[in-house]
Swiss-Prot record:
PTM remark: Phosphorylated predominantly by CK2 on two serine-containing clusters; involved in cell cycle regulation activity.
The organism's taxonomic lineage, starting at the top: Eukaryota, Metazoa, Chordata, Craniata, Vertebrata
Role, per record: Regulator of p53/TP53 stability and function. Inhibits MDM2-mediated degradation of p53/TP53 possibly by cooperating in part with TXNIP. May be involved transcriptional regulation. In vitro has intrinsic transactivation activity enhanced by EP300. May be a transcriptional activator required for the expression of glycolytic genes. Involved in regulation of cell cycle progression. Proposed to disrupt Rb-E2F binding leading to transcriptional activation of E2F proteins. The cell cycle -regulating function may depend on its RUVBL1-mediated association with the R2TP complex.
UniProt name for this protein: Protein ecdysoneless homolog
Region (Disordered): 499-521, 554-586
Gene: Ecd
Source organism of this protein record: Mus musculus (Mouse)
Sequence segments annotated as region (Involved in nuclear export): 481-497
Length: 641
């Protein structure tokens, strides 16, 4: 973030920075204490939605980051989201809400792609904004997205720097001019659409399935459900060395397996299901035939057991759990626990009950990973945490087995298979399109104007493009198509040379031939030159007419659709110098004019139809110009009826 703002970031990771708007000068230690208090308040206030969340790799976390270079001291966090992009957008939602709850804070979010919020709103960005000048311009403030603009060349705004601002300048600008830096409504809507539905949307991203698991794993998941992610990743990223530990299980014996309900995220469930794996015969984790009604539960349990065994095999079974006690020994723990109680985190559960203890253990782990953040040398690995739970939290296999009869039903996993219609709907939702209405489809077919295709093509090619390429319409469904016929004809007149420009170049061959003549001769020469150009233009048109006449009788000429003649009689020719020349090669055959619009439309429709509903050159070209053709009613019985 220092300097140009380009970071060598970890792949599939999101970084977030929370700055305190400068209001007065503070000492380093005082600023540190203030930011630490903010970290405690933020993590406590948002604990009800952060604690139960199942993260793919790492949880949301904040820590104090001292000042460095031109970047002031601030709160900082980084989360590796791996394959689950929803973790990244959930963090965007949390950051957005933090700046809404704490208006004195300004936040920025970025990942290894840079300003990914701008990528999400790419269709609505102003032309001046590009990756080269976007450094330190995109922030969240008061829950709104802010983009610090660039002053125009024609105007000078004292508080806007001409170069990309530093972090200090950006914070001062946002503090002094919050309304002037708000992003446009379309950009705000594009980002809001991506984070809409949270926190309720978290529940929709979960999947509950039955798994035939060792009782020890069931007990661990009751205490620390977040360890499910580590186990799935261990199995998903296994190597032959990891599988050596799974030849003979030492921690999770297959004889202790019971049926249990496990809550996954959809990403974790898909990762576990899609991998084909045959266990070692020595492991004892045999599978029933695929036709068995509980085959999926056995398979999921076998894969999870391998993941947990791999994690435990990477640590010693004899270690001190003194690192765990560091959580309750922290001076922040007491105030954190008190804040959780004030925010009704325990949902009225009785102190000391089993469910109360489960939520308390979840809070301890959340506190350790997100607030306490011990040094890496003291941090516990997932395998050590699993063994700690097994050693400190006794469980009764018989009692867990009695819960098999009261398991909640499994969720349907049909969402793993997408139909073409569902895929189209997902693409439309991602692009921010409104849902198509099936009712007025027939009316849309009747009112569709085919001329829109040719008009769009003409309007597109008549525009002059910059060195960056052709500009496509941003919202073609709403903007009417405009076509200036005069400009279009003038453009081709210039190509054909109908309006030759006078040249003063010294390289003109005519000047060498008339060197030394007087002014009257100059006037005569200009008139002669004009007549010569007119004659050349007439010869060119005559040549093109004769070429059309010759091609008209070939297969190429017959492939074009011509206008129907209203008058079958041969057309009368006006007396001119070129009439005999034009007719001499044509004989008695008259050449009918080619209908350019009709040929253009018919060729595009033929190409579009041959795509059979798939992506192709015709649909891509038309969509880029804002033209969306209706479905072919000739091949759709429901529409034709």
């Amino acid at each position: 973030m220092e300097g140009s703002g380009k970071l060598a970031m970890v792949e599939d990771a999101v970084e977030y920075h929370l700055f305190l708007i400068p209001d007065k000068a503070r000492g380093t230690e005082e600023h540190r204490e203030i930011l630490q208090k903010y970290i405690e308040r933020i993590m406590t206030q948002f604990a009800p939605i952060l604690v139960p969340y199942i993260w793919q790799n790492q949880p949301f976390n904040l820590k104090y980051k001292p000042a460095k270079g031109g970047v002031p001291a601030h709160m900082y966090g980084m989360t590796k989201f791996g394959d689950n992009i929803e973790d990244e957008w959930f963090i965007v939602y949390v950051i957005k809400q933090i700046t809404k709850e704490f208006p004195e804070l300004v936040a920025r979010v970025e990942d290894n792609d840079g300003e990914f919020l701008l990528i999400e709103a790419a269709d609505f960005l102003p032309k001046w904004l590009d990756p080269d000048n976007s450094a330190n311009r995109v922030f969240f403030h008061h829950g709104e997205l802010c983009i610090i603009p660039v002053p125009r060349k024609s105007e000078r705004i004292p508080w806007l720097p001409m170069t990309p601002p530093t972090i200090q300048q950006a914070l001062s600008i946002i503090s002094a001019h919050p309304e002037a830096v708000l992003a446009s409504e379309s950009i705000q809507a594009a980002v809001d659409r991506r984070v809409s539905g949270y926190p309720e949307r978290v529940e929709a991203s979960l999947h509950r399935a039955h798994c035939f698991l060792p009782a020890g794993i069931v007990a661990v998941l009751k205490q620390q459900p977040r360890l499910l992610s580590a186990a799935v990743q261990a199995f998903y990223l296994r190597d032959p060395i990891d599988l050596r530990a799974c030849r003979v299980f030492k921690t999770f014996l297959p004889e202790t397996r019971i049926m249990a309900s496990v809550t996954f995220t959809k990403c974790l469930y898909a990762q576990l299901v899609q991998q084909k794996f045959v266990p070692d015969r020595r492991s004892g984790y045999g599978l029933p035939p695929p036709s068995h009604p509980q085959y999926r539960a056995y398979e999921l349990g076998m894969k999870l057991a391998h993941g947990f065994e791999i994690l435990c095999s990477k640590c010693s079974p004899h270690f001190s759990d003194s690192r765990k006690s560091l959580v309750t020994a922290s001076p922040l723990w007491a105030s954190f626990l008190e804040s959780l109680k004030r925010n009704d985190y325990f949902k009225g559960l009785m102190d000391g009950s089993a469910q109360y203890q489960e939520r308390l253990e979840m809070a301890k782990n959340y506190f350790q990973l997100s607030i306490h953040r011990p040094e890496s040398s003291l941090a516990m690995s997932p395998g050590e945490e699993i063994l700690t739970v097994l050693q400190t939290q006794p469980f009764d296999v018989a009692e867990l087995k009695t819960e098999e009869a009261d398991l909640p039903p499994e969720d349907d996993d049909q969402w793993l298979d997408l139909s073409p219609d569902q895929l189209d709907q997902l693409l439309q939702d991602a692009a921010g399109r409104k849902e198509s209405q099936p009712g007025p489809q027939k009316e849309e077919l009747q009112n569709y104007d085919v001329a829109q295709v040719s008009d769009s093509m003409k309007a597109f090619i008549s525009k002059v493009s910059s060195h960056k390429g052709a500009e496509l319409p941003r919202d073609p469904s709403e903007a009417p198509i405009t076509f200036d016929a005069d400009s279009f004809l003038n453009y081709f007149d210039k190509i054909l040379g109908a309006k030759p420009q006078e040249s003063d170049s010294e390289d003109d061959p005519g000047e060498e031939d008339v060197e030394g003549v007087d002014s009257d001769d100059d006037v005569g020469f200009e008139a002669q030159e004009s007549e010569s150009l007119k004659g050349a233009l007439g010869s060119l048109k005559s040549y093109m007419a004769r070429m059309d006449q010759e091609l008209a009788h070939t297969s190429m000429g017959r492939s074009f659709t011509t206008r129907e003649r209203l008058n079958k009689d041969p057309p009368s020719h006006t007396a001119n110098d070129n009439s005999d020349e034009e007719d001499s090669g044509a004989g008695d055959c008259a050449v009918e004019a080619v209908d350019v619009d009709l040929n253009l439309i018919s060729n595009i429709l033929e190409s579009y139809s041959s795509q059979a509903g798939l992506a192709g050159p015709a649909s891509n070209l038309l969509h880029s110009m804002g033209v969306r053709l209706p479905d072919n009613a000739d091949h759709n019985p429901q529409v034709s009826q």
